[in-house]
Amino acid sequence: MHQELSKTTQDYNQLASKFDELSSIKNQFEQQTIKVQTENQGLQYRLTERDEQIHHLTQERQNLTEKLTALSQELTGLQTTLTEKEKYFSAQQQNFEQSKQQLGVEFQNLANRILDEKSRSFSQSNQTALETLLKPFREQIEGFQKRVNEIHSESVKGNAGLEAEIKKVLEIGLNMSQEASNLTSALKGEKKTLGNWGEVQLERALQLAGLEENVHYRAQAHFKDEQGGRNYPDFVLNLPDEKHLIIDSKMSLVAYESAVNSEDDFERERLLKEHISALKTHINDLHKKDYSNLIGMCSPNFVLMFIAVEPAYIEALKADPALFNYGYERNVIMVSHTTLMPILRTVANLWRIERGNAEAKEIAEKAGEIYNQICLVAERLNKLGNTLSTVSNQYNSTVTALVGQQGLVGKVERFKTLSAKANKTMPDVDLLNNQLDLARLNVLNQENLQ
């Protein structure tokens, strides 16, 4: 009995030892399980972060694709405009050439007819007088031709400029990433440096649109308000009819640059909010300056606030969709390079139309002057024809009185036989048969004036 109890105790101890061993293994397994779960959570967090990065890169690629599509559409539109311009100017040049040739031929024919039919009736003095009459008209024709050639040359230059602008648009699309890289140094600089950088980018956009400084826009122009204070808007865009459009380019992007470089999500979100707050502060400052009511300014009741960095503009609107309306309610329109370029190109087209209208008006006035000169030449030719007809009639009357049946020649012919000194021969004096056909001349004048 004692031996059995001892054996049972021994078995119990062995079982207890086994139980302790199994408990230790269980604890180790549980610890290992917790460690694996912790590692799994870390991997899951990293996987989520990687998915967010992939989503961000996908979104960025989509944005770049949309920009490339927009640039391609703009390129297609510019090419279509170029083709239409070439057709228009070619048709204008052809019309001018045809009009010039037709006028030249018609007046040359008119002059040839008059000169051929009446050449024997004109003395040297009459021919000189006719040349004097036709000289102003010839000078007008030459001036008209010179102006047509100038317009054609300017149209060719305009087409070449349009092609250059298309190439510049492509270069802008291809170099957008490089521009973003070059921005880093400016974003980290002082406020003055950043403001100057924004002005440089805005002026490049103005020049890319085909606008000229001190002609289509002014930088840092001086204006006074009603209290006599001085104001210097960054850029004042001149519009036809002496109107203006104001563009501001001094926008602080320090918070945005910090947000881009931050690796912490919460810090990045905080910095983006600070970026939006800086935008709102600048909007409020522009609203208080009230540029549109400055003395000498004829501008719509809003200011364009140019944000030189496209992603800073996009991220701000994504983070705060109501930001654009916030500026709009305060008469401040936020624009980036992409949204500003169509506005600038519209202004450039307005100036081209204004210039075309001015040239068309000048040509119309010149045509009116030429028409009046033609009428004057026709009137003088008509008067000259009447004068020549009168002179011709007087000449024929004198000839009739001299050599007619009852003329002086018949009466003095016998004097030749009475005097030895009468040794000269009486020349033949004929009547002029080529009288000016005034009716026909009037018909020719009317045909050429139509």
Curated annotation (Swiss-Prot):
Keywords: Coiled coil, DNA recombination. It holds the Pfam family RmuC. Residues 3-89 form a coiled coil. Gene3D superfamilies: 1.20.5.340. InterPro entries: DNA_recombination_RmuC (IPR003798). Signal peptide: none annotated. Disulfide bonds: none annotated. One of its GO terms (biological process) is DNA recombination. Involved in DNA recombination. Belongs to the RmuC family. This is DNA recombination protein RmuC homolog. The lineage of its organism: Bacteria, Pseudomonadati, Pseudomonadota, Gammaproteobacteria, Pasteurellales.
